[in-house]
Design a protein with these regions (language model features):
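N-terminal beta-strand/beta-hairpin edge segment
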Residues: 11-17, 27-53
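Hydrophobic packing positions in regular secondary-structure scaffolds
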Residues: 46-50, 56-100, 106-419
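Terminal domain-initiation and capping elements
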Residues: 2-11
Length: 419
């Protein structure tokens, strides 16, 4: 069975030569980040008379016995300088936030675990528990025994590297993309500003994902990360957000930037956002998304399903297809299941619910919530009060986001930080 060792076992401990004489003190271990699930350890930084030197792993022995010996003939006396892609395990990882990609949480690296795998030493895991923290702080042998259940496999870990000089690394976008945008937003909100910037920079490689993450951020963090962007860049980001979310954010931007950003939006998005901004933010009009899936009364089931497939409407609004008459008034609504079960040639209206309820844009959100609850709906149509024309939908997720208090995820134990 592979023996796992604590990084702290070696830190600030003596390193001896082959004669057993002390030659210096271990400052850190150096690992190389790349495509390896477990980064290989390439050497150690040792301090001799105030000078930090690098010793490659091929000249180091004794690790299995919990000590470090120099097994070379002579030391390279040049000062240590890290190379691109190298991490110092203690300086860059220990006591810092890391991303647990499996759980979508931040963890604190209270201990780094290393092991010899097929003749090579590698970083195999992280212990985020309190026991290793107290062991390091108090300098005791408390809990030297490895608690395998507490160790997080380094293969599921992504470190922050923005603080690492000349690392030339960034958080891999493809790894973050496996998380839900809400999980990524939670990570950003719980991280430091610098760590959050690193995450935003990584997801920025996928503009749609970046917009999805921004929509999930709280207002404080949205404004924080827009601050350093030009008005044009801010408008590009908002143009990819849902119109209702873009309108909410524009409402919060400093007044001296608001108009410029609004006028920089594409014409179609700008028109929708301006319309939404005409409503009070706490009303159905302010909450609604003007984009929804609709078909005329003459549409068949096949045409309704084609409308869903070709639509750019977000997932929440995509769950319901509305049938509108020639005046744009809803006369039926169907979720996807009845449409999928029906024959392609059937009229969409024949499988739709025709007893519909609705709200008007001036209704406050509590009245909207009661209506949605009473009729057990997840998507509620908003009709123009004067003509009865359908102008948007309120979805249950947007409504909950407004009704629940700020920081509700932390209040209900859904924090993105593991302790």
């Amino acid at each position: 069975m592979t023996e796992i060792l604590h990084l702290s076992t070696f830190l600030r401990r003596a390193i001896y030569d082959s004669n057993g004489d002390r030659i210096g003190r271990v400052q850190d271990l150096v690992a190389r980040l790349g495509n390896d699930a477990h980064p290989p350890i390439v050497g150690a930084v040792i301090r001799i008379e105030g000078r930090d030197l690098f010793v490659p792993m091929k000249k180091i022995g004794g690790l299995r016995e919990g000590k470090m010996t120099f097994e070379g003939k002579r030391l390279d006396l040049r000062r240590f300088e890290r190379r691109p892609g190298e991490l110092l395990l203690a300086e860059d990882l220990l006591s810092r936030h890391l991303i647990n990609l499996v759980r979508g949480r931040l963890i604190i690296a209270n201990e780094i675990e290393i092991a010899e795998m097929e003749g090579k030493w590698e970083v195999v895991g992280v212990d985020p528990g309190r026991r290793p923290f107290f062991r390091r702080i108090l300098g005791t042998n408390l809990g030297q025994r490895i608690n395998a259940d507490a160790i997080v496999d380094f293969a599921s870990i992504e470190p922050f590297v923005g603080h690492v000089p000349s690392a030339r690394l960034r958080i891999p976008y493809r790894k973050l993309a496996k998380l839900h945008p809400a999980q990524i937003a939670d990570l950003v909100e719980q991280a430091s500003h610098e760590e959050g910037e690193e995450i935003i920079e990584a997801v920025g490689l996928d503009r749609e994902l970046e917009a999805d993450v921004f929509e999930e951020l709280d207002t404080e963090h949205q404004l924080e990360f827009l601050e350093d962007r030009t008005d044009v860049d801010a408008a590009r980001l908002l143009s990819r957000m849902e119109p209702d979310n873009a309108a909410d954010l524009i409402n919060e931007i400093d007044q001296d930037r608001r108009l410029t950003i609004l006028e920089s939006l594409p014409a179609d998005q700008q028109s929708k956002v301006r319309h939404l901004l005409s409503y009070n933010a706490d009303t159905a009009g302010g909450l609604m998304n003007p984009d929804f899936v609709s078909v005329p009364a003459t549409a068949t089931v096949a045409e309704a399903l084609d409308a869903v497939r070709s639509s750019n409407v977000p997932g929440e609004s995509l769950h319901v297809v509305f049938v509108l008459d020639e005046n744009g008034q809803p006369i039926g609504a169907s979720s996807l299941a009845p449409l999928v079960r029906a024959r392609d040639t059937d009229l969409a209206l024949s499988v739709a619910r025709t007893q519909l309820t609705h709200v008007h844009p001036e209704w406050d959100m509590h009245r909207v919530a009661r209506k949605m609850s009473d009729f057990n709906l997840t998507v509620l149509p908003v009709l123009d009060a004067e003509h009865g024309k359908m102008i948007g939908v309120v979805t249950v997720d947007d409504l909950l986001e407004e009704l629940l208090p700020q920081g509700w995820r932390r209040e209900f134990g859904m924090t993105a930080v593991e302790e």
